[in-house]
């Protein structure tokens, strides 16, 4: 991890060209790491936004896909858990504009003072309706403490549904049998799945490797797999370029390569 401190950041933000979304379409823009802008049914949703250059002592090695001031007006913000690479208070304070934010149970006190209109804390399988959206919190296999003594904080993924379209942001998770139940409960079309940090310095099994992400995708019965949570911060010992290569190889072995969409930061894709 130490050599990363001296590694020059790659990439460079550019003004994104957000397309006009037609009725029934979903536009997904990967900002980097687990951060996404999701546009559907005339609303803009920001998930796990982080524009910061450092996670305490961990350096950001890939620039965000675009600058924060290029964001459209954000209607709703979702945060999957309290870890610093997902809940970045500095970024949240900049995007807060009196809109609702949705977090797992026990995370609300970390965001209540940042400028959001209302904080919705969800329990597992609970749903909140925000405008045209139905947003549900799903379980995952991870952990939620921001510091050593706050083990009460929940963590999870979000299913976002509107107008017959459904997208799933997994948050952080190791592989676990619960993916099948998530697939049984929701008709997921697009699955945003983490594929990095599987060679964790702690040795804890709290992140999927790329092969397990393919297995989770199959059990979710989704139509498109978009990988995330790799290439931005060095959170594991694996090479930064390795996760998407292994993912495509595993998908090819299962005849699923055409269902994998490896995105470029800052480049919107309409589905």
Question: Predicted segments — roles?
Answer:
Residues 3-23, 103-165, 245-271:
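Metallo-beta-lactamase
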Residues 11-20, 31, 37-82, 89-94, ...:
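Pre-active-site segment of Zn-dependent metallo-hydrolases
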Residues 25-27, 95-101, 165-167:
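Short active-site oxyanion
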Residues 27-30, 45-48, 134-140, 166-172:
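Active-site-proximal beta-strand elements of phosphoester/diester hydrolases
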Residues 38, 48, 81, 88, ...:
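Divalent metal-coordination and catalytic microenvironments
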Residues 48-52, 81-82, 138-142, 171-173, ...:
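Active-site metal-binding loops of divalent metal-dependent hydrolases
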Residues 55, 87, 111, 145, ...:
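Glycine/Thr-rich phosphate-binding loops of Rossmann-like dinucleotide-binding domains
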Residues 76, 100, 106-110, 176-264:
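Cap/insert and terminal regions of metallo-dependent hydrolase folds
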